[in-house]
Amino acid sequence: MIVGRKEEIAELEKLYYSDRPEFVAVYGRRRVGKTFLIKQALKDRITFQHTGVSPVDQDSDKSRMKVQLESFYYALLNQGLEGYKQPKSWMEAFFQLEQLLQHLDTGERQVVFIDELPWMDTPRSGFLPAFENFWNGWCSGRDNMMLIVCGSATSWILSNLSRNKGGLYGRLTAEVKLSPFTLRECEEYFEHTQIQMSQYDILQSYMVFGGIPYYISYFQKGLSFEQNVDKILFGSKPRLRDEFNRLFAAIFNNPEDSKKVVRLLATRHAGFTREEISNATGIPLGGGLTNTLAALVESDFVMRYHPYG
């Protein structure tokens, strides 16, 4: 069962039953439930699905491209591809996907779901031009095609899909931004999982975990709010051990700079000016800080505001 997300589910259903090709981007911060939403909303209706490999713990750019291509090829094999060798380029890989989809085509809606798409776009891999060609040269001419892409690296989705000025300009037919649970949705979640929580404890859980479904999914029946928090964040083997470092490494191109900014902002309730951030972190005021702040804002980690007076 999906808690909340009624508008997002209705949007996906509407797009599924449209009579034209659809290119949908679903984005939002990591752990917010994007993959779960898509798989539950379109259960048993996905023709092909693949998830990019996390860049965390990967080495050189060349090695990362090889790993991504390898993983994509195995997904093709697992879902019915026959008679093709492992692709050496993304252009070849998407050609193989086209062949598989043609083989599986019954005339009904075909849903292609590519999760964590930004991870697949490794440096100098030629991924984006090949992906553009896949949509522009093949998918867009098939009325039964529904391509759904998903990613936690919101800045990548916005820069390369929503605001693309090249081959994918204006190609998205829908965008779905998935936000954390509201306070009411947190309450619904605890009711659904039969975890007894007072109104005050639900409010505290929201303040600590920010309405992120993945985090509150670790709450256990029979434990108090304090016991659950201790088990998730502090105990001898906390569930979210090293989450901070792994989260930033998976989302941002410059995780160390992003962490510096977040740590600094956490020290003052009223926030900092760009100049103050630059002076305190050593990140140059030019493109470096601008890009870092833009990525953090777009990923809902920080917010920009203009003080009055």
Feature map (PLM): residue ranges:
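Phosphate-binding site recognition
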Residues: M1-G309
